[in-house]
Amino acid sequence: VDPLVQKLSGHDLFRTYCASCHGPTGAGDGPVAPSMRRKPANLRQIAKRNGGVYPSELVYRVIDGRQPVRGHGGPDMPVWGDVFARSSQVRDEAVITARIEALVRHLEALQARTAN
């Protein structure tokens, strides 16, 4: 596995690849957001928009992007599976999977907590 993947946490990957659009906390308020046609999603509300359940498999597929998910993502969101494949020296699917899984876990940790 790519040593870079072993060193980068989901937080680091998010900061590198996602925060410019989605903001440092995932609220959809990154510095690039005002110039976009569609406002980036508030990633802290994924579970709330899904009846209180964090849909990790769906989030994985949306981030990967190589198999479009109807109604999710969009033309402004890069196909991260391809981006990670190009950035990996060995183009190892395990590296791509590890990066996306780290992002999925990080996004799960960002979910806004609601009072019961």
Write out the residue ranges for each language-model feature.
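Electrostatic cytochrome c docking/interface patches
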Residues: 1-13, 51
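His/Cys-centered metal/cofactor-coordination and adjacent catalytic loops
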Residues: 1-6, 19-20, 24-46
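Post-cleavage N-terminal segment of exported redox proteins
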Residues: 1-6, 104-116
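Sequence context surrounding c-type heme c attachment/ligation sites in exported
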Residues: 8-19, 90-98, 112-115
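The canonical Cys-X-X-Cys-His
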Residues: 10, 14-24, 77, 103, ...
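Activation segment of ePK-like protein kinases, specifically the conserved APE
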Residues: 26, 67, 111-112
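Short, hydrophobic secondary-structure boundary micro-motifs
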Residues: 30, 72-73, 116
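Extracytoplasmic electron-transfer domains, predominantly the class I c-type cytochrome c fold
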Residues: 36-98, 103-107
